[in-house]
């Protein structure tokens, strides 16, 4: 079987040194402390990949001079597959753009991880596997399996373009979907873009590397922003649209993921019932929970205890 790796981008936002560097670049920011609170999602993310995706050869965690708590991960799985990758490694040749606090800049250089397999799956640390997964969930017949749906590109919707620009002016985080739409435009899709769901994203290293070889100026522009900017595309989405353009993909035959987008609105009882239904549904293998740190401690404890049981059974 062809080798497949996992890549996760992560930062310990509670680290005072990191916060100091961040503040030096940005200055005052609303809700700063809340933004950087975390609930050790990286432990659950990494552990779930190693447990439920045994075909994964290596798990690369890309971070800024930090390391997650490997002892916590060892409570659930062996850590011999894990490699910690510093930003300095992937920014070799682009050191002038460091430090960066911009996930869209970091993501653009993931293909430069030394020893990375040709095919890899890109995860955020709030994405989890909750049931056994096989390589064919991600790559089938040598093609990436893409999970999402088609939507109209932003260049065909003037009001959305304006709203995205206003967000940038007000320093509100630029639209995630607009960044995917821009990626589609770059790849030659003017009317529709393939909108990704929040689960792992299959990537092909040679496709990304080959594109930047012929478009070095585009890469340097992408790296030039310290923080997310309306003028940036979403890198993994660019890879997806290049795969689609070359008919080198498969659309996921059915949705195997669930998103809990606003967990702050979930009462403990509601979350319990949701997790019970997740266990019953054999088709659902992937879970995304956004902003776990914004909900109640009781709700967080319910989620973690449920996940701990899955990892230890």
Predicted feature residues:
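Short, acidic, metal-binding catalytic loop of nucleotide-sugar glycosyltransferases
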Residues: 48-56
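Long, charge-rich alpha-helical interaction segments
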Residues: 145-226, 230
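A solvent-exposed, charged loop/short amphipathic helix patch at secondary-structure junctions
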Residues: 13-37
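Short catalytic/ligand-binding loop motif for oxyanion handling, primarily in non-cytosolic enzymes
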Residues: 14-18, 67-72, 92-93, 128-132, ...
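Long, low-complexity C-terminal extensions of enzymes
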Residues: 3, 230, 234-313
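GT-A fold catalytic core of metal-dependent nucleotide-sugar glycosyltransferases
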Residues: 67, 109-150
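Short beta-strand/loop segment that forms part of the nucleotide-sugar
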Residues: 57-66
